[in-house]
A protein has these predicted regions:
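Mature-chain termini and adjacent capping regions
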Residues: 1-187
Length: 187
């Protein structure tokens, strides 16, 4: 289950990478690094594995922790290949090489030492390496800098990120918002 946990953690961390890259205008996503030395702890109120369907569902107070990084949500679903890719004995869940996509729902929250990302939903396609975060507001913050939109799409392989506004219904401006905090020069 260790490789499986690393992939789940990578999903949460990739959300933060997207925010940092957009705020810093870097051409590539360079911050996606997992610490192989720190243990990964996954907790939820319930874990249901439907091996025949290729689904593992974590529900209720889902927490994924590695070092200072935390991913929280109400539900996390893992979809994995069931085509007999693994000839070994049945396990308590999919191995990392078989995972196709991850979906996180219900108040998605990811935090590192300096960054926070929130959304209503998020998904990560392992084959295409595309991360999508959506919600009434997708908020990315890093050291006082804040980005707000309603849909963030990140091509992890190329570093291309797109943040869409929220449409113009129910008082929303339909525009992406960014707040940048200049660093103090007096010290």
């Amino acid at each position: 289950m260790s490789k499986f946990a690393i992939v789940l953690f990578g999903f949460g961390l990739s959300a933060l990478v997207a925010g940092a890259a957009m705020a810093q205008s870097e051409p590539r996503m360079t911050g996606l690094k997992l610490s192989g030395d720190d243990p990964i702890q996954i907790e939820s109120d319930r874990l249901e594995v439907r091996d025949a369907e290729g689904i593992a569902i974590f529900t209720g107070n889902v927490n994924v922790v590695q070092g200072p990084t935390l991913l929280k949500s109400g539900k996390m679903t893992v979809y994995y290949a069931t085509d007999g890719a693994s000839e070994s004995a049945p396990s308590a869940g999919p191995d990392a090489s078989r995972i196709e996509r991850l979906e996180v729902d219900e108040n998605v929250y990811v935090k590192t030492e300096t960054q926070v990302a929130t959304a209503d939903k998020a998904s990560f396609d392992m084959k295409t390496e595309v991360l999508v975060m959506t919600g009434k507001e997708v908020v990315l913050s890093d050291d006082g800098n804040v980005l707000v939109g309603c849909k963030l799409t990140v091509q992890m392989a190329t570093g291309h990120a797109l943040l869409d506004g929220c449409g113009q219904s129910e008082g929303a401006s339909g525009r992406v918002k960014m707040l940048l905090q200049p660093k103090s020069q007096s010290q």
